[in-house]
Amino acid sequence: MRNRQMLIFIIVVLLVAWPIYQLVDLYLAKKSEKDSNILLYQVSLFQIELLNNLIYDSMNASNTEQLNVLKQFAYTSDYSHQHLVLAYGDSKLTNMNSFLDIMQYIIRLQLGGDRLLKPEEVAVIQELNKAFTEIIEVYENLLSEDGKIISSQNDKLMQLDEVVSEYLRKILLE
């Protein structure tokens, strides 16, 4: 009789404890996902800050070969931002086409091999520097303290990205 009561008690405890354990596990899993999204955002921000610094440094470039590092960081910035878009969803975070447009512009400059940059090509890099200074300011404030995308900042980011993309595409079509 005592064994039977003990068995019933254990079953009741398991029936109560198991759902509580599942709820705690679910909460911790969501927290872990949120933390990983914040870390991914920090990586993406770091990549874009590096890209911005390289754009600034590239204003002093004298030939097309010196733009290789800028091209590589445009790619890594695009790569990290695309993964951030995948993590948050493209309905919450905009894709940034300007990274690929920067790559295309540099590739176009380098098609003729290593040559001196023309003054108008350096002027394009100077315009990119101005634009990316604004993009960095917006990107730094893209996430709220709890790790969610701030839609007003995302809208600003989308507008700035469109301006840069349209500018580069216009130049690429010349």
Model-derived features with residue positions:
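Extracytosolic low-complexity repeat regions of secreted or lipid-anchored proteins
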Residues: 131-148
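Alpha-helical segments in soluble extracytoplasmic regions
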Residues: 54-115, 143-167, 173
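Transmembrane signal-anchor/signal-peptide helices with a preference for the extracytoplasmic
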Residues: 17-39
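Short extracytoplasmic/periplasmic juxtamembrane "stem" segments immediately C-terminal to an N-terminal membrane anchor
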Residues: 34-51
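Short, Lys/Arg-enriched, disordered terminal segments
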Residues: 1-7, 172-174
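Surface-exposed, polar helix/loop patches in the mature regions of secreted/periplasmic/lumenal proteins
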Residues: 103-133
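Hydrophobic membrane-insertion alpha-helices, especially the h-region
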Residues: 4-23
